[in-house]
């Protein structure tokens, strides 16, 4: 039996609701950090025997590798531009008896400067999402962004972005990660420990022609 992920908040293959987004359309063809930014409900079942812990990895694989034209007036990021993964939520060491996370457990709202990394309300430890890196140097927004922060793709990006809400079943109770660990750290730590994984995928864009 494969690990199956479901959600009361995310409809697979459909647009992620503004309630779970960081950025939303501003009505003038651009975007603003005014979404609800609530982490979605997630539940999972069918994990294999021998599962010692779970990890949540929420990521967008459609983020432009070159950020120089991101959200720039008069510039367009073509759909075929090179892309990289952008983490929106990283939680490891979730106890094996936890198979559901309530809506809002990873974020209730936008916190300028980020939420602290560390222990979660449902068990496990949260690292730093990629807004930590993306907003570095922005005097108004920079900080360490722990726990969940939702979609905020460039308003001038022609590509539809896909948000993978992935659960890993692992054969170890702890990956040994702490502090502001990032997506690369999780990917390296789970190597050789993944028993199974499942996911649901939502979509989001802020490009005016796709709204």
Predicted region positions:
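N-terminus-centered regions that define maturation/targeting leaders and the start
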Residues: 1-211
